[in-house]
Amino acid sequence: MTSGPPPPPRQPDLDDDIVLLAAFLLSSGHGLLDEPPAYGPARCADGARRALELLDTHGTPDPALTRVREQLENAMCGSMADVDLPSLLRTTCDQVLDVVMARRAGASRLL
């Protein structure tokens, strides 16, 4: 016997997409064993972009997170020589954390 209500059913596509994200992260880690160190931050940014894409596809799209995903896509699709990757990572991380903090502040006001 389990306690609490059963978890909500998940969409098979979401499960597959999460597994594919895990495979991407694992293959990225493996690739980094032989790739130049500078590839690591770009692969992490692409992993974040893929995770945010899952939210857009399977969740309730959040305009602020969609903008972050689009910033990452624009950086990843262009010439990486033109991208200030440290600044992009710092800025987009701050933007994602701002969304989380705003959500939590809103949820605590409802209690």
Which role does the model predict for each range below?
Residues 71-111:
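Amphipathic alpha-helical binding modules
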Residues 12, 35, 59, 79, ...:
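Charge-dense, low-complexity intrinsically disordered segments
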Residues 17-20, 24, 47-50, 67, ...:
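Charged, amphipathic alpha-helical oligomerization/scaffolding segments
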Residues 2-39, 93-101:
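Short terminal alpha-helical segments
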